[in-house]
Amino acid sequence: MALKLLGFNQDATCFSVISSNKGVTIYNCDPFGKCFELEKSTSNDEELDFLVEMLFSTSLIAVVDKTIGASKRKKLKIVNTKRKATICELTFPHEIMDVIMNRKIICVVLKSDQIFVYDISCMKLLRTIDVRGEKLKSTSKFRNSEAVGDIGVRVSLSTDNNSILCYSSYSKSDKENAPLNDIVVFDALKCIQINVLPAVHQSNIVCIACSPDGMLMATASEKGTIIRVFKTIDTENDEPILVNEFRRGSRPSRISEMKFNHDNTLLACVGESDTIHIFALPVTTTEADANEDDTLQQSSHSLSSSINGLQYISKGLANRFGKIIVSKIPTQSQQRHVAYIKIPENAKYRIGFPKDTTNTIHICGEDGNYLVYSIPRNEVGPCTLVKSNTFD
């Protein structure tokens, strides 16, 4: 029986999976068990394919049935899992490629590189973003194609109510090749663009992760060897700054998912390799500790330790660390992981950070394993398995 993972919800309390003989199943993480099943609508033996986006642990989910038929792939259903009833249905002009949402906003991404932004409370359309833009539409490179290869627009939405939307966009500086390597930061509630990060990678961006509060954003390109973390907005000069550069490895590997933990101190990534990498981030806060000056006198040692990923930066450095790290990155090697998890190379895995449990990461795989690991805090090393369950 084939399994296909759909992923965790926003706070890693549930995850969803497709099984060939059942359809979509949502599992609760603690206590572990099934909490919802969406049975397949056909008795045929075709391979099932769905998009499912959960809204935390609520009874609301967004579903796109992409199994068979072009018309189904254009249709979004909002389903109440308790009543097992469709409460809203929307049809779009092109195939739906992704759906993301939080408690305020739902965003639908089409194969035509359009993003539809809705108020989730009433499903009112707030904005349609045409990522390709009028200039690119007029060029011969895009006239007769719906998307560029298999690289489409990538999106990520902050899970809090600020609703910061980050999405990839075609390069404004390289109009000849037009790679998807610019990033636009968009306030989805106010429907205004608040920042643009040009050419964050040389090639197409294949994965974006927005931090829960929308203050940070991680990006990875097709090569997947380097992960970059940016501030979405610099509070002093309104320009984005590079917070960290992480080296995942030397061999190319397409990264399928990245996640920040809920206090923005860790970033995890998973892809085609046999390792889930966890990187340490500097603490960012506007509150300075009383002993900030004393801490800053020892900043050389603290910064060196943090750069090597061996400990987290103290809160006393938080206000000044953003400026320090930018000057340090160009002259130092890219940072490696502080923790890792080995996984079977032939099984796809998804990752999630629980909000209420610190120093813990959840993973689930298409081999039918749901695993909880403890992350080492004071030294580089493997994560420790603390809980395991199986699902089908």
Swiss-Prot record:
InterPro entries: PROPPIN, WD40/YVTN_repeat-like_dom_sf, WD40_repeat_dom_sf, WD40_rpt. Gene3D superfamilies: YVTN repeat-like/Quinoprotein amine dehydrogenase. The gene is ATG21. This is Autophagy-related protein 21. Contains a beta-propeller domain involved in specific binding to phosphatidylinositol 3,5-bisphosphate (PIP2). Required for cytoplasm to vacuole transport (Cvt) vesicles formation and mitophagy. Involved in binding of phosphatidylethanolamine to ATG8 and in recruitment of ATG8 and ATG5 to the pre-autophagosomal structure. Protects ATG8 from ARG4-mediated cleavage. Its main location: cytoplasm. GO terms for cellular component: vacuolar membrane. It is a peripheral membrane protein. Belongs to the WD repeat PROPPIN family. A motif (L/FRRG motif) lies at residues 246-250. SMART domains: WD40. It is found in: Cytoplasm; Membrane; Vacuole membrane. WD repeats lie at residues 200-240, 250-289. The lineage of its organism: Eukaryota, Fungi, Dikarya, Ascomycota, Saccharomycotina. GO terms for biological process: autophagy; protein transport.
